[in-house]
Amino acid sequence: MRAIITFALFCVLYITVQAKTSSPKVQVYSHFPGEYGKENTLICHVSGFHPPDITIELLRNGEILPNTQQTDLAFEKGRQFHLTKSVSFTPERGLDYACKVRHMSNTNAYSWEPNM
């Protein structure tokens, strides 16, 4: 019995060491070049993160945009994950559009630049 417990603890320790934490890489862009007053799609692509504990929000002036679509969580080589969230929107001059990403205990907002 003691050998089984020791082996189980070894396995948990091994998995913990192998599962390195990786911060997400975030890209915020639109489907078409940004033009105020023209319908578009705001996209936030988050990749290269581990563990998969993550929340993505699309914002207009700090308020959550409704009717967003999110892909299923997918993984890459090296136990890293990626996820994309999008929403149809019509950009208005003077308003700020952003993607807020919470990964583990870190939260950051990334702005959409219409000239990208």
Swiss-Prot record:
Residues 24-111 form the Ig-like C1-type domain. Disulfide bonds join C44-C99. One of its GO terms (biological process) is antigen processing and presentation of peptide antigen via MHC class I. Keywords: Disulfide bond, Immunity, Immunoglobulin domain, MHC I, Secreted, Signal. One of its GO terms (cellular component) is MHC class I protein complex. Residues 1-19 form the signal peptide. It is found in: Secreted. Its main location: secreted. It comes from the Eukaryota. It holds the Pfam family C1-set. SUPFAM superfamilies: Immunoglobulin (SSF48726). Gene3D superfamilies: Immunoglobulins (2.60.40.10). Heterodimer of an alpha chain and a beta chain. Beta-2-microglobulin is the beta-chain of major histocompatibility complex class I molecules. Component of the class I major histocompatibility complex (MHC). Involved in the presentation of peptide antigens to the immune system. Belongs to the beta-2-microglobulin family. This is Beta-2-microglobulin. The lineage of its organism: Eukaryota, Metazoa, Chordata, Craniata, Vertebrata. The gene is b2m.
